[in-house]
């Protein structure tokens, strides 16, 4: 199981590096004003400075460090923890949290990509929100 956790950690770090690289590579191309909030229909309804483009990568980094490394508490598990199942339950908890983090980081990257594309006028001015919301039901 440690191999799976190590693979998942590597995958999370890869997503973080891709998110930060994409942001830094496109920052100088962005106009001074970019969309920073989108309504439920996916259309931008608030605009702000291009420095807001760093909000999602910073939140992703905080999410990775604060949630990814604070899973070792055994007092919040839905089953009784015994000496026999302690290690297995810990691995299951770590896998669950890291999988959710991976999904959220992927959504952050998708939103970042759409914000950059809309700002550079490479795509239509909406984010397809429905598929991300429906994806939450499969977690």
Where on the chain are the PLM-derived regions?
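Alpha-helical transmembrane segments and their helix-start/interface "positive-inside/aromatic belt" motifs
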Residues: 1-13, 48-57
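Cysteine/selenocysteine-centered motifs that mediate thiol-based redox chemistry or coordinate metal-sulfur cofactors
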Residues: 70-108
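Membrane-water interface of transmembrane alpha-helices
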Residues: 21-31, 64-78, 106-113
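Active-site and channel-lining beta-strand-loop segments
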Residues: 23-54
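Interfacial helix-start motif at the membrane-water boundary
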Residues: 43-61, 92-98
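Hydrophobic core of alpha-helical transmembrane segments in multi-pass integral membrane proteins
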Residues: 13-22, 57-69, 133-139
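Short, basic/aromatic recognition patches
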Residues: 4-29
């Amino acid at each position: 199981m440690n191999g799976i956790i190590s693979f998942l950690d590597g995958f999370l770090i890869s997503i973080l590096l891709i998110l930060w690289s994409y942001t830094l590579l496109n920052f100088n191309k962005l106009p001074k004003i970019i969309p920073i909030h989108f309504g439920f229909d996916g259309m931008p309804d608030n605009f702000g400075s291009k420095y807001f483009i760093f909000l999602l990568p910073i939140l992703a980094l905080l999410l990775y460090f604060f949630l990814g490394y604070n899973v070792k508490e055994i007092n919040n598990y839905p089953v009784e923890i015994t000496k026999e199942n302690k290690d297995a339950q810990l691995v299951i908890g770590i896998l669950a949290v890291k999988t959710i983090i991976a999904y959220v980081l992927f959504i952050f990257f998708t939103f970042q990509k759409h914000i950059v594309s809309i700002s550079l006028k490479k795509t239509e001015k909406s984010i397809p929100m429905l598929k991300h919301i429906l994806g939450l039901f499969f977690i």
